Swiss-Prot record:
Gene Ontology terms for molecular function: FAD binding; flavin-dependent halogenase activity; monooxygenase activity
Keyword Oxidoreductase: yes
Record's description of how this protein is used: Melleolide sesquiterpene aryl esters are cytotoxic secondary products with anti-cancer potential. Armillaridin shows therapeutic and radiosensitizing effects on human esophageal cancer cells. Armillaridin induces autophagy-associated cell death in human chronic myelogenous leukemia as well as of hepatocellular carcinoma cells. Armillaridin can also inhibit the differentiation and activation of human macrophages and thus might have potential to be developed as a biological response modifier for inflammatory diseases.
Binding site residues for FAD: G17, A20, E50, V330
Keywords recorded for this protein, A-Z: FAD, Flavoprotein, Monooxygenase, Oxidoreductase
Record protein name field: Flavin-dependent halogenase armH5
Length: 523
């Protein structure tokens, strides 16, 4: 049960009770750390973004929460279908090729997020809902601003009943969502990506047909480019019998279409769904829109110059948001949460200096969101999306190099020693990851696997095109298509499980992923 009174002091204060805040606070509490979590609203609360990635199951397993998610009978998600080029068959990502036990769920976020928050309470986190952080106090600061010499030491709060108070802390985790109190109010270092300044309109439907119902792909979400190539739509079946259907486009496109089209958000939403024939086929004659369910949300893509500072970490949407495409939000949130907890503990235990811990966290967040950013940009290029351009300013060069150094010989060439990120290099990497969306069948995959063996393993080396040509017959187009797709999937192979924290070194350190010993160790 939630605690009754906000204490005057704690070791770690967490702002925000979404997946990032709940997960980070749970990790720390299970390590014996005193944690207080302040959440502005009362759970359950509505939230869009129902489609999860395979890593979700493994993150939950680490905190002993996986079985509760299974018990809730959330919709099984075996993979995802993408229709980015009309006139061609859809591309399907089968999570089984990622390895055993890599399926996940489509969840009702209000229920799923509350499960995580209540689990945090059961692990010893002191949780106070409907309690908003109004301001943060810093040490060594005349005007209460962030400087290299200052660190956050206390937070002023106000709850729903009007009570106010102040809590001091040794460490701060900002998981306040898009509000991002540290980034936007104090550090002022949030950077928006103009090319992905998107908005979404979404609603809920009943009696919608399930994609390939009854087959191995049954219940997979469907993502589709609009026929005018000015946006895309999602369709995600949920376990409560409803289906989440949304449409995403650039803010400028949305403004223009609203001005030119039917008035009102609901009519705009319904009119844009007519540009998604695959969605219309699944809605069919039986599907019905739930009146009044349509909502709109800004899905602006952003990042920051840093995600940490002296005794604080920023995670989840408070740190960065890539794009609703590919459902990376909760994965990035939990990755950031594990990074925050591990680096705080590493600093506490003297395993690394606080400066080293900050650098590790900054790099981990940057690498994770940069990988998904490149996949998103590749998808928009595959859609030939009107008005969307990959801009060099949208990508942090150091994060790009850390995320894709393994792939540099593939997209740049073995003998290119340039160290600066260029538009050409960015474009080449986007082209490389476009192979993710090459339509291949399960039959093709199995047949190619029999012919090439371990070459198809996701854990194997990245193979340049000339190397593929050496081991494949020149006319073996199926094998080339499958292996090029597997090559591209390797971009995300370290984002399928928290176990990658133990093997993917950042600045010479990895995470000791054992309960009771969580922290950083030399690689």
């Amino acid at each position: 049960m939630p605690s009754e009174y906000v204490p005057e002091a704690t070791t770690v204060l967490v702002i925000g009770g979404g997946p990032a805040g709940s997960y980070a606070s749970t990790l720390l509490a299970r390590e014996g750390i005193d944690v207080v979590l302040l959440e502005a609203v009362k759970h359950p609360r509505e939230h869009v973004g129902e489609s999860m990635l395979p890593s979700m199951r493994h993150y939950l397993r680490f905190i002993d929460l996986e079985s509760e998610y299974d018990a809730r009978k959330f919709m099984h998600k075996p993979g995802a279908a993408f229709k980015f080029v009309h006139g061609q068959r859809e591309c399907y990502t089968d999570f089984k090729i990622l390895g055993p036990d890599r399926t996940t769920w489509n969840v009702f976020r209000a229920e799923a997020d509350e499960l995580m928050l209540r689990h945090a309470a059961s692990q010893g986190v002191k949780i106070f809902e409907e309690t908003r952080v109004e301001s943060i106090t810093f040490s060594e600061s005349v005007d209460n601003s962030v400087s290299p010499e200052s660190r956050p030491i206390a937070a002023s709060w106000k709850n729903k009943s009007g009570q106010v108070g102040k809590i001091s802390f040794n460490w701060l985790i900002d998981a306040s969502g898009r509000q991002g109190i540290m980034s936007t109010k104090y550090m002022k270092n949030r950077i928006y990506r103009e090319g992905l300044r998107n908005v979404a309109a979404y609603g809920y439907w009943k009696d919608v047909t399930v994609f390939e119902e009854g087959g191995p792909r049954s219940n997979a979400p469907w993502f589709e480019c609009l026929t005018d190539r000015e946006g895309w739509a999602w369709l995600i079946p949920l376990h409560n019998g409803t289906t989440s259907i949304g449409v995403v486009m650039h803010q400028d496109t949305s403004n223009r279409k609203k001005a030119e089209g039917p008035s009102g958000l609901e009519q705009h939403y319904l009119s844009q769904l007519k540009l998604a024939p695959g969605v219309q086929d699944l809605i069919g004659s039986k599907g019905s829109y739930v009146p009044g369910s349509v909502k709109s949300t800004a899905d602006y893509s952003y990042h920051a110059t840093e995600y940490s500072g002296d005794h604080y970490r920023i995670i989840g949407d408070a740190a960065a948001f890539v794009d609703p495409l590919f459902s990376s939000g909760v994965h990035v949130a939990m990755t950031g949460a594990l990074s925050a907890a591990s680096t705080i503990l590493g600093s506490m235990k003297g395993q690394v200096t606080e400066v080293e811990a900050q650098a590790w966290h900054d790099a981990k967040i940057g690498i994770c969101q940069t990988r998904f950013l490149l996949v998103v940009l590749s998808a928009y290029r595959q859609m030939q999306h009107v008005g969307n351009k990959a801009l060099l300013d949208d990508v942090n060069a150091s994060n790009f190099d850390a995320a894709f150094s393994l792939f540099r010989p593939i997209y740049q060439g073995e003998h290119d020693t340039s160290t600066s990120l260029t538009n050409e290099e960015l474009s080449k990497m986007i082209e490389f990851t476009r192979n993710l969306f090459t339509p291949t069948t399960h039959q093709q995959y199995n047949e190619v696997k029999q012919r090439v063996g371990d070459l198809i393993a996701l854990s194997g080396p990245v193979m340049p095109s000339d190397e593929l040509d050496k081991v494949l017959d020149s006319d073996d187009s199926d094998a080339k298509a499958v292996l090029k797709r597997i090559n591209s999937l390797k971009v995300l192979r370290n984002d399928t499980s928290p176990e990658s924290f133990t093997s993917e070194a950042v600045n010479g350190y990895v995470v000791n992923l054992e309960r009771g010993q969580l922290g950083l160790v030399r690689a």
